[in-house]
Structures are given as C-alpha cells and as structure tokens.
C-alpha cells in the first residue's frame, strides 16, 4: 500500500547522513525530481540549509527536504521497503554515491587488511574531519567524530537512540553483540 509509512532503512539513512554532513551534492539527480510533487520534490537542488541536526529545530520545509533526501537516496541504493524493516546493501550504497551523487569514495574491507590497519584508517579519516560509513552484517551507520581521548562518535541512525562516544577497539553493535565494522566507505 503506497499510503503506509515504512522505515527508511539503515543504508539510506547512513548515506543521507553522510551527504548532509558534506552538504553535497547541491543539485539533485534529475531522474529523482518530481514536478507533480511538493515544492521540495520539485526542487532541483537539495535544501541543505533547511535541514537541521534535530527534527525539532526544523520547519515544514526542512522536514520535506529530509524526506526528499531520504527518498532520493532510497531510490539510488535500491532500498526494499517493508513495515518491519527496510534493506539494501553497502555495494549499492557505494555505487549510488559514485554514480548518482558524484562522490569519490573508497571501499575498505577489514578482512583483507593486516591487524590494526582498519582501526588506523578509520581513526585517520575521523581525525581529518571525514565521517565514515560503516557496514556490518546487520546494520549500516555513520562514525562522525573523534575526541581527544580517541573515542569515536557513532550515529546509529535511530533518531539519537544509543548514539554516543565509544572506544573503537571494543565497540559492539547494540543489535547482535557482534564486533562491528567489516566494511567502511570513506571519501577519497
């Protein structure tokens, strides 16, 4: 039913957060512009200045802009929507960032790296001000900061629930008690 709200899905949410962080691209892919929709859907540009870190800080234009962003990204990453959860995969996220949103990104897989190198790469990206998109067996999310003690900030994509500062070396997902981070996507 097209009138039922479905979860946006972790892949679309994490990719949208990465794009919001960078405020890029400025122009929407033309294939996603809907001339029969709302003003935000008709817009050929992303309304980054209307989007805020917290939905309580946004007016209707900002909320519509978030909806458009999530919709565009959902289409680009081939989200499969369902009432109990929506899915995609990190390869589609990588393809979408490159082909639809003009990002230069690299895919790094932990399993093919010497011990400690994955950790070092993530820390370096964060220290240089670049958020890191993480994918693991059951969830995708964004690492978006590092503090002076070396703790990393995790945005799980659940409207702030469980977001916080974690010791990267011992970080577990709140979902399934598995060590996270088999794949990362970072800007090149």
Enumerate the predicted regions with their spans.
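Cysteine-nucleophile protease catalytic domains, especially the papain-like/related folds used
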Residues: 8, 12-110
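Gly/Ser-rich catalytic serine loop of serine hydrolases
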Residues: 7-10, 137-139
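Active-site-adjacent substructure of cysteine-protease-like catalytic cores
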Residues: 95-155
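An acidic- and aromatic-residue-enriched active-site/binding cleft used to recognize and process polar
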Residues: 15, 24, 37, 137, ...
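A conserved hydrophobic secondary-structure block that centers on an alpha-helix together
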Residues: 1-6
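Cys-His-centered catalytic/binding microenvironment captured across papain-like cysteine peptidases
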Residues: 127, 147-188
């Amino acid at each position: 039913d097209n009138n039922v709200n479905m979860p946006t899905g972790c892949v679309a949410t994490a990719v949208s957060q990465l794009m919001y962080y960078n405020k890029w691209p400025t122009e929407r892919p033309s294939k996603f512009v809907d001339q029969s929709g709302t003003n935000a859907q008709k817009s050929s540009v992303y309304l980054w200045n209307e989007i805020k870190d917290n939905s309580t800080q946004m007016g209707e234009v900002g909320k519509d802009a978030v909806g458009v962003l999530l919709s565009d990204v959902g289409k680009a990453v081939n989200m499969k929507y369902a009432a109990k959860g929506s899915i995609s995969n990190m390869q589609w996220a990588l393809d979408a960032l490159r082909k639809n949103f003009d990002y230069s990104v690299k895919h790094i897989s932990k399993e093919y790296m010497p011990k400690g190198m994955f950790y070092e790469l993530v820390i370096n990206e964060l220290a240089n001000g670049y958020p890191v998109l993480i994918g693991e067996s059951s969830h995708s999310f964004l690492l978006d900061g590092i503090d002076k003690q070396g703790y990393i900030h995790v945005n799980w994509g659940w409207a702030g629930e469980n977001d916080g500062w974690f010791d990267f070396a011992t970080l577990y997902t709140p979902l399934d008690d598995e060590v996270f981070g088999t794949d990362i996507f970072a800007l090149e």
